Amino acid sequence: MGIIVISTVYLLGYKIGTYFVLGYMLFGYMLNSYMGASSNSISKKLKRFEREGILFGRGALYLGIGTIAVLGFIDYLPLALSMLIALFISDAVATIVGIGRKTKLPYNKNKSILGFIGYFGSFAIAAYLFIGIYSIPLGAALALIESISIIFDDNITIAIAGIILYKIISFI
Protein backbone atom coordinates (compact mmCIF):
# COMPACT_ATOMS: atom_id res chain seq x y z
CA MET A 1 0.00 0.00 0.00
CA GLY A 2 2.84 2.39 0.82
CA ILE A 3 4.39 2.09 -2.63
CA ILE A 4 0.99 2.86 -4.18
CA VAL A 5 0.50 5.97 -2.04
CA ILE A 6 4.03 7.29 -2.63
CA SER A 7 3.84 6.57 -6.37
CA THR A 8 0.45 8.24 -6.68
CA VAL A 9 1.66 11.47 -5.09
CA TYR A 10 4.91 11.39 -7.07
CA LEU A 11 3.36 10.61 -10.48
CA LEU A 12 0.20 12.70 -10.26
CA GLY A 13 1.73 15.62 -8.42
CA TYR A 14 1.05 16.94 -4.97
CA LYS A 15 -2.50 18.26 -5.31
CA ILE A 16 -4.11 15.59 -7.49
CA GLY A 17 -2.11 12.83 -5.81
CA THR A 18 -3.38 14.00 -2.41
CA TYR A 19 -6.98 13.73 -3.62
CA PHE A 20 -6.37 10.19 -4.81
CA VAL A 21 -4.71 9.26 -1.51
CA LEU A 22 -7.70 10.64 0.39
CA GLY A 23 -9.89 8.44 -1.81
CA TYR A 24 -7.69 5.43 -0.98
CA MET A 25 -8.01 6.25 2.71
CA LEU A 26 -11.80 6.56 2.52
CA PHE A 27 -12.07 3.26 0.64
CA GLY A 28 -9.72 1.60 3.12
CA TYR A 29 -11.74 2.91 6.06
CA MET A 30 -14.97 1.57 4.58
CA LEU A 31 -13.35 -1.80 3.85
CA ASN A 32 -11.85 -1.88 7.35
CA SER A 33 -15.24 -1.12 8.90
CA TYR A 34 -16.82 -3.93 6.92
CA MET A 35 -14.07 -6.39 7.80
CA GLY A 36 -14.17 -5.43 11.48
CA ALA A 37 -17.91 -5.98 11.67
CA SER A 38 -17.94 -9.07 9.48
CA SER A 39 -17.32 -12.62 10.61
CA ASN A 40 -16.22 -14.08 7.28
CA SER A 41 -13.04 -16.12 6.94
CA ILE A 42 -10.96 -13.25 5.53
CA SER A 43 -11.73 -10.93 8.43
CA LYS A 44 -10.97 -13.72 10.92
CA LYS A 45 -7.55 -14.21 9.33
CA LEU A 46 -6.85 -10.46 9.32
CA LYS A 47 -7.85 -10.10 12.97
CA ARG A 48 -5.02 -12.49 13.91
CA PHE A 49 -2.54 -9.72 13.08
CA GLU A 50 -4.02 -7.36 15.68
CA ARG A 51 -3.04 -7.48 19.33
CA GLU A 52 -5.53 -8.91 21.78
CA GLY A 53 -8.02 -6.33 23.01
CA ILE A 54 -7.12 -3.78 20.31
CA LEU A 55 -9.76 -2.37 17.97
CA PHE A 56 -9.48 -4.02 14.56
CA GLY A 57 -7.63 -1.72 12.16
CA ARG A 58 -6.46 0.78 14.78
CA GLY A 59 -2.93 0.83 13.35
CA ALA A 60 -4.28 1.50 9.86
CA LEU A 61 -6.41 4.32 11.25
CA TYR A 62 -3.37 5.97 12.86
CA LEU A 63 -1.42 5.51 9.64
CA GLY A 64 -4.24 7.25 7.77
CA ILE A 65 -4.27 10.14 10.25
CA GLY A 66 -0.49 10.54 9.93
CA THR A 67 -0.70 10.43 6.13
CA ILE A 68 -3.45 13.04 5.98
CA ALA A 69 -1.50 15.27 8.39
CA VAL A 70 1.66 15.04 6.28
CA LEU A 71 -0.18 15.77 3.04
CA GLY A 72 -2.18 18.54 4.68
CA PHE A 73 0.68 20.45 6.31
CA ILE A 74 3.79 19.76 4.22
CA ASP A 75 3.46 21.38 0.82
CA TYR A 76 7.05 20.77 -0.32
CA LEU A 77 6.73 17.64 -2.47
CA PRO A 78 10.21 16.11 -1.84
CA LEU A 79 9.76 16.32 1.93
CA ALA A 80 6.16 15.10 1.78
CA LEU A 81 7.30 12.05 -0.20
CA SER A 82 10.12 11.47 2.29
CA MET A 83 7.67 11.59 5.18
CA LEU A 84 5.43 9.08 3.39
CA ILE A 85 8.49 6.83 3.13
CA ALA A 86 8.96 7.25 6.89
CA LEU A 87 5.35 6.28 7.60
CA PHE A 88 4.82 3.47 5.11
CA ILE A 89 8.23 1.90 4.55
CA SER A 90 10.67 2.68 7.36
CA ASP A 91 8.19 1.94 10.14
CA ALA A 92 7.44 -1.45 8.59
CA VAL A 93 11.15 -2.20 8.12
CA ALA A 94 11.80 -1.35 11.79
CA THR A 95 9.06 -3.75 12.86
CA ILE A 96 10.16 -6.59 10.58
CA VAL A 97 13.87 -6.26 11.38
CA GLY A 98 13.45 -5.54 15.08
CA ILE A 99 10.69 -7.88 16.19
CA GLY A 100 11.84 -10.59 18.56
CA ARG A 101 15.42 -9.31 18.82
CA LYS A 102 17.17 -9.60 22.17
CA THR A 103 19.37 -6.50 22.05
CA LYS A 104 17.05 -3.71 23.19
CA LEU A 105 17.51 0.04 23.25
CA PRO A 106 18.67 1.31 26.66
CA TYR A 107 15.85 3.87 26.87
CA ASN A 108 13.04 1.64 25.56
CA LYS A 109 13.01 -2.07 26.30
CA ASN A 110 10.17 -2.62 23.80
CA LYS A 111 12.33 -1.55 20.83
CA SER A 112 15.47 -3.20 19.49
CA ILE A 113 18.71 -1.72 18.24
CA LEU A 114 18.30 -3.56 14.93
CA GLY A 115 14.83 -2.05 14.49
CA PHE A 116 16.30 1.41 15.07
CA ILE A 117 19.06 0.77 12.53
CA GLY A 118 16.54 -0.67 10.06
CA TYR A 119 14.35 2.41 10.34
CA PHE A 120 17.26 4.80 9.93
CA GLY A 121 18.88 2.89 7.07
CA SER A 122 15.72 2.36 5.05
CA PHE A 123 14.71 6.00 5.42
CA ALA A 124 18.16 7.42 4.66
CA ILE A 125 18.50 5.34 1.49
CA ALA A 126 14.95 5.74 0.14
CA ALA A 127 14.50 9.41 1.04
CA TYR A 128 17.90 10.29 -0.46
CA LEU A 129 16.18 10.15 -3.85
CA PHE A 130 14.01 13.11 -2.83
CA ILE A 131 15.91 15.20 -0.27
CA GLY A 132 19.53 14.19 -0.82
CA ILE A 133 22.00 14.31 2.06
CA TYR A 134 19.31 15.73 4.37
CA SER A 135 17.87 12.22 4.57
CA ILE A 136 20.65 11.27 7.00
CA PRO A 137 19.95 13.76 9.84
CA LEU A 138 16.19 13.56 9.26
CA GLY A 139 16.36 9.76 9.30
CA ALA A 140 18.29 9.82 12.58
CA ALA A 141 15.77 12.22 14.15
CA LEU A 142 12.76 10.22 12.97
CA ALA A 143 14.29 6.89 14.04
CA LEU A 144 14.85 8.35 17.51
CA ILE A 145 11.28 9.65 17.68
CA GLU A 146 9.90 6.30 16.47
CA SER A 147 11.87 4.44 19.13
CA ILE A 148 10.71 6.58 22.06
CA SER A 149 7.70 5.13 23.80
CA ILE A 150 5.04 7.76 24.45
CA ILE A 151 1.27 7.76 24.73
CA PHE A 152 0.63 8.40 21.01
CA ASP A 153 1.04 5.94 18.16
CA ASP A 154 4.34 6.32 16.31
CA ASN A 155 2.55 7.00 13.00
CA ILE A 156 1.15 10.16 14.53
CA THR A 157 4.34 11.25 16.34
CA ILE A 158 6.46 10.74 13.22
CA ALA A 159 4.03 12.83 11.16
CA ILE A 160 3.92 15.59 13.78
CA ALA A 161 7.73 15.61 14.06
CA GLY A 162 8.09 15.93 10.28
CA ILE A 163 5.56 18.75 10.18
CA ILE A 164 7.27 20.63 13.03
CA LEU A 165 10.71 20.23 11.44
CA TYR A 166 9.33 21.44 8.10
CA LYS A 167 7.73 24.50 9.70
CA ILE A 168 10.94 25.35 11.58
CA ILE A 169 13.09 24.97 8.47
CA SER A 170 10.68 27.00 6.33
CA PHE A 171 11.06 29.96 8.70
CA ILE A 172 14.86 29.94 8.39
At which residue positions do the language-model features occur?
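Charge-lined substrate channels and their catalytic hotspots, especially those that engage the 3′ end
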Residues: 27
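Interhelical loop and helix-boundary elements at the membrane-water interface
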Residues: 1-20, 30-129, 133-172
